[in-house]
Amino acid sequence: MADLPETPAFGAAFSDEEEAARALEAGRWLFSQTCSFVMGCVSLDTLPDHDLSEIAFAGRSNVGKSSLVNALTGRKTLARTSNTPGRTQELNYFRLGPEAQDPALMMVDLPGYGFAEAPKDAVKRWTRLIMAYLRGRPALRRVCLLIDSRHGIKENDRDVMRMLDEAAVSYQIVLTKADKLKAAEITDVLARVVAETAKHVAAHPDVIVTSSQSGAGIDLLRAQLAALASP
């Protein structure tokens, strides 16, 4: 894979090398801990009751949400992956961290929105569930909004971004599948995404470029998410 571009949006996550080293080590430590599947939820009234911070992974169908969860945790089969758009149809909860000990996180792998190889009524049902969860979950600390780096931000992504802005829910753009692009292409899509993201009030300023295949950007994302863990 081509080297990731050195841009302010990609490299300004930490104020100095010492802070970066501490944050990266905290991320490495947390994501090396036990991570286990908790439950799959098909409605808001079945969401688990807990006191941990939640991090949700959202994006279009087949954008690589489950692959990213697996890459973050270093477990190839934690979240079920598929080449079939729409395979994930529940809100899948995973608990990350030492048992009965802080820090810890609850990660939520959401169904994809947009095109899916599933009945239309099922797609509508889980799309409503996704939007209701994103708007009204008190435990939700951040949404990682995954964007396929080959395609950039699409209109249904913009719909989600506007909804999160209106609900004042913090979200961070994570570009996926960067291994599919050349360095110049990555630089171009990153610049366009950073410029558009800057117009959204709830968007985190750092856009992270990742590849679940090569591991690029995974350490940085681990570090930023570990900072949100319940103390």
Swiss-Prot record:
Cell cycle as a keyword of this entry, yes or no, is yes
Q: Quick check: keyword Nucleotide-binding in the entry?
A: yes
Return the InterPro entries for the record.
Answer: G_ENGB_dom, GTP-bd, GTP-bd_ribosome_bio_YsxC, P-loop_NTPase
Task: Specify which residues bind GTP according to the UniProt entry for this protein.
Answer: 59-66, 86-90, 109-112, 176-179, 210-212
- Provide any one GO MF term from the record: metal ion binding
GO biological processes: division septum assembly
* A Pfam family: MMR_HSR1
The residues that cross the membrane are none
Q: Which GO terms describe its cellular component?
A: cytosol
Q: Which cofactors does this gene product need?
A: Mg(2+)
Domain EngB-type G span(s) in chain numbering: 51-231
* The entry's keywords: Cell cycle, Cell division, GTP-binding, Magnesium, Metal-binding, Nucleotide-binding, Septation
Renumbered to this chain, the signal peptide range is none
Q: List positions binding Mg(2+).
A: 66, 88
**What function does the entry list?**
Necessary for normal cell division and for the maintenance of normal septation.
Q: Which PANTHER family match?
A: ENGB-TYPE G DOMAIN-CONTAINING PROTEIN, MSS1/TRME-RELATED GTP-BINDING PROTEIN
Please give the family membership noted in the entry.
Belongs to the TRAFAC class TrmE-Era-EngA-EngB-Septin-like GTPase superfamily. EngB GTPase family.
Q: This protein is called what? A: Probable GTP-binding protein EngB
Q: What is the source species?
A: Rhodospirillum rubrum (strain ATCC 11170 / ATH 1.1.1 / DSM 467 / LMG 4362 / NCIMB 8255 / S1)
What's the encoding gene here?
engB
